[in-house]
């Protein structure tokens, strides 16, 4: 009984010195992504009103099987696309510690992460644009040519308030903030390929042109210390601040290369391209 009493007394003592709060949120939502579907008709026939591309589903299967066999690359789905997802994670935590009568410490942590799906750029290229949208009545793109956005914001702060005497107080604040905006790719790395038919855009496969290595990062670390002295009718504050910033922005257009072919046959037989771009 004596041991139990001592343990409970120590627990109550700790609780009165420590206060903490934790909150987490998770939000997931979906929305229609690719509204277009490939044509099921023999040879392919487009219907703008019903969002049917002229790209024949058998042609998509032919190219999919070809690149899988020759290059070991899976271009992704070409029918029955999943809805686009939007994911958001939030976490917040706070700890207040009454160290003693003279010193109080507060720690705060916040992080937010979001991911959102997006469809391939409609007409962009390395030099001249495609002459029609990559998802539309004239053309269709494989699923792994789409991409996503990823955003992360994380902050951590610590604040120590000290009373050295009735007339001398000190406040120490340390903060760190991390911000990163990047993109996510679908599938393995592969050059982006546009295939034309009858002089117009017909199908697209490969990694989206502007996604790989598209990354922005910003880190800030700071320390601020202020001493306040009460001199009767006068209040004197002196302090110092240190701040370190790190910023990075990377961008490469078509890092895996870009190729445009006049027809499916030209692509599969290795004929000369209409246009290409490599780093």
Go through the PLM ranges and name each one.
Residues 1-117, 148-170, 174-176:
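Transmembrane beta-barrel wall of Gram-negative outer-membrane proteins
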């Amino acid at each position: 009984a004596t041991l139990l009493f001592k343990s409970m007394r120590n627990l109550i003592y700790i609780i009165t010195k420590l206060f903490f709060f934790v909150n987490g949120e998770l939000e997931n939502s979906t929305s229609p992504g690719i509204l277009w579907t490939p044509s099921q008709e023999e040879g392919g026939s487009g219907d703008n009103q019903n969002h049917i591309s002229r790209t024949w589903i058998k042609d998509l299967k032919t190219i999919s099987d070809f690149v899988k066999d020759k290059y070991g690359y899976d271009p992704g789905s070409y029918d029955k696309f999943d809805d686009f997802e939007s994911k958001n994670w939030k976490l917040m935590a706070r700890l207040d510690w009454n160290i003693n009568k003279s010193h109080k410490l507060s720690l705060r942590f916040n992080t937010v992460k979001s991911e959102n799906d997006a469809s391939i750029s409609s007409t962009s290229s390395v030099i001249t644009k495609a002459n029609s949208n990559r998802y539309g009545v004239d053309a269709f793109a494989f699923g792994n040519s789409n991409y996503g956005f990823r955003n992360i914001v994380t902050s951590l702060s610590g604040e120590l308030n000290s009373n050295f005497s009735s007339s001398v107080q000190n406040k120490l604040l340390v903060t760190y903030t991390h911000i990163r905006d990047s993109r996510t790719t679908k599938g393995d790395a592969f050059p982006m390929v546009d295939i034309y038919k009858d002089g117009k855009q017909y199908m697209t496969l490969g990694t989206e042109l502007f996604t790989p290595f598209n990354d922005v990062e910003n880190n800030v670390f700071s320390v601020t210390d202020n001493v306040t002295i009460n001199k009767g009718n006068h209040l004197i504050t002196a302090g110092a601040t240190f701040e370190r910033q790190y910023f990075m922005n990377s961008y490469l257009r078509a890092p895996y290369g870009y190729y445009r072919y006049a027809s499916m046959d030209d692509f599969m037989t290795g004929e000369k391209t209409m246009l290409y771009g490599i780093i």
